[in-house]
Amino acid sequence: MIQEQTMLDVADNSGARSVMCIKVLGGSHRRYAAIGDIIKITVKEAIPRGKVKKGDVLKAVVVRTKKGVRRPDGSVIRFDGNACVILNNNTEQPIGTRIFGPVTRELRSEKFMKIISLAPEVL
């Protein structure tokens, strides 16, 4: 459950280390984002010579949450932290060329197959 002002780790090599959610996209008064949802973020901490810099406002897809995701068989997959993958504002494709850490099968939609293929582990 990601809401406005939530700090997230970045699970790709775009150059950002820490980002903050500034808006949950998809609905006029939507409060929370879960795994697979797109959010608007601002970069709070970045490494030198990265593809993004501090202060950039971009889109991102949530790939891991502490709240987790419930499967139809009743199992729940939770993670130790909240993480996202930064997307291009126009094409909504990942900016980075590598994904760090596991991602869930819920991302397996037409939009995010690139993230699934780059991820080292799909749960």
From Swiss-Prot:
Coiled coil: none
GO molecular function, one term: structural constituent of ribosome
Pfam family, one: Ribosomal_L14
Key word Ribonucleoprotein present: yes
Cellular component per GO, a single term: cytosolic large ribosomal subunit
UniProt keyword list: Ribonucleoprotein, Ribosomal protein, RNA-binding, rRNA-binding
GO biological process: translation
Subunit description: Part of the 50S ribosomal subunit. Forms a cluster with proteins L3 and L19. In the 70S ribosome, L14 and L19 interact and together make contacts with the 16S rRNA in bridges B5 and B8.
Family statement: Belongs to the universal ribosomal protein uL14 family.
Task performed by this protein: Binds to 23S rRNA. Forms part of two intersubunit bridges in the 70S ribosome.
HAMAP family given in the database record: Ribosomal_uL14
Identification of the protein by name: Large ribosomal subunit protein uL14
Provenance organism: Actinobacillus succinogenes (strain ATCC 55618 / DSM 22257 / CCUG 43843 / 130Z)
